Amino acid sequence: MPSSDPIEILLKHDRWATRQILEKCVPLTPEQFNQKFEIGPGSLHAATTHLVSAQRTWCDTLAGRPVRPHLDKEGKNRTPAEIMALQDEVSSEFFALVSAHPPDQTVTRERGGKTHTFTRGTVFAHVLVHGAHHRAQCINMLRRLGVTPLPPSSVVEWSFMGDK
């Protein structure tokens, strides 16, 4: 039976929805995957790399370790399959880190020379909303490239497809 825990549902959905985007990118040519659009990070490559990189950064914060360099700042042109492999690793770690501690526990992160304190629940909510925001941009880019059908992305669609 599928989980009824909203945190587990949202974590599983986030992983699944990002994978749906990346799977639709696999058959694209490198030119299509890197095509510039006036939305978000600017291309499917940039947006999906940013999504994984941001979640990895928040994993570092939740784990209490130094933040690793952003993947989207490396200038490496990854394939959709390479980004999918990174996403599998990062989303599994995020799931474990969110599940391991209470949401009211705090974590700190330095950014722009300032130290910020967040609850783990705030980080969880931010990462998932951030992911949904950029996935919507990716769906727009896929639509503009003529990809059909567009990938499913809602929690209900995820539920219909079997709680993966």
Predicted segment positions?
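Short, charged low-complexity linear motifs
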Residues: 1-2, 44
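Residue-level preference for long, well-ordered alpha-helices that form the structural scaffold
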Residues: 3, 7-10, 79, 83
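Short, contiguous alpha-helical
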Residues: 8-73, 112-164
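Helix-adjacent hinge/juxtasegments
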Residues: 64-104
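A short coil-to-beta-strand element that immediately follows conserved catalytic motifs
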Residues: 101-108, 149-152
